[in-house]
C-alpha cells in the first residue's frame, strides 16, 4: 500500500499482518481526497486532523502528504498503535503527529491542540461504532465550526450522526460508503 499523492507520493506504508485492521484502499483514499480538494475548497491544506480508528494511519498520512499541518491518530489497539509508530517513523512524520490511545466512542474532552478542522473515521465495518464516535467528537468539542468529518463504513450501514453534524456528501464505492459531514456553528 502506498501514499497516493503529495510530498510523500509513492512511499510505502506498512500494512497489518492480521485481518483485525482494514486499511483504506489506495483507490478509496484517492477518491476521498479528490472530493476534499475539489468540492470543499481544499479542506486538507493546513488542516489539523484527527483520525479515529486510525489503524495503519493511511488517511492521516495521506492528509499530511497533501499539506495538512498536524494529525492526531487515535486507536485503542496495541497492534494498530505499533503500526502507526512504524509508519510515522519510516516517513519522518514524528513532528507532525501524535498517537493517542483511546476508545473512539468515549473520547472525553478534546486534548490540547484541538479543536480539529478535519476528522476521519474508519471504524470496523458492521459494528455500529461510527454513530457513537461521531457523538463523542461533538460532545467533547473536538471539532471547530465548519470542520469536515469523513466517515468510511460498509455500503449498507446506517450512519447516525448527531444534529450538529450536517450531511453534505455521500457516495458508495463497491462495498464501502463515504459520508461527509460539516460541523455546525454550535457543538
Summary of predicted features, one role per range:
Residues 1-187:
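Class I S-adenosyl-L-methionine-dependent methyltransferase catalytic core
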Amino acid at each position: 500500500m502506498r501514499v497516493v499523492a503529495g510530498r510523500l507520493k509513492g512511499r510505502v506504508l506498512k500494512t497489518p499482518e492480521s485481518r483485525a485492521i482494514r486499511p483504506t484502499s489506495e483507490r478509496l483514499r484517492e477518491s476521498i481526497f479528490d472530493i476534499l480538494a475539489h468540492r470543499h475548497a481544499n479542506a486538507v491544506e493546513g488542516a489539523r486532523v484527527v483520525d479515529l480508528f486510525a489503524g495503519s494511519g493511511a488517511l492521516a498520512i495521506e492528509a499530511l502528504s497533501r499539506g495538512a499541518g498536524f494529525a492526531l491518530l487515535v486507536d485503542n489497539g496495541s497492534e494498530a498503535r505499533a503500526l502507526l509508530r512504524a509508519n510515522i517513523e519510516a516517513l519522518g512524520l514524528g513532528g507532525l503527529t501524535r498517537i493517542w490511545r483511546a476508545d473512539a466512542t468515549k473520547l472525553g474532552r478534546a486534548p490540547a491542540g484541538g479543536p480539529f478542522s478535519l476528522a476521519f473515521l474508519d471504524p470496523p465495518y458492521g459494528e455500529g461504532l461510527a454513530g457513537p464516535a461521531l457523538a463523542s467528537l461533538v460532545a467533547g468539542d473536538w471539532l471547530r465550526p465548519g470542520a469536515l468529518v469523513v466517515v468510511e463504513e460498509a455500503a449498507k450501514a446506517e450512519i447516525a450522526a448527531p444534529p450538529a453534524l450536517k450531511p453534505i456528501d455521500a457516495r458508495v464505492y463497491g462495498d464501502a460508503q463515504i459520508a461527509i459531514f460539516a460541523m455546525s456553528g454550535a457543538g
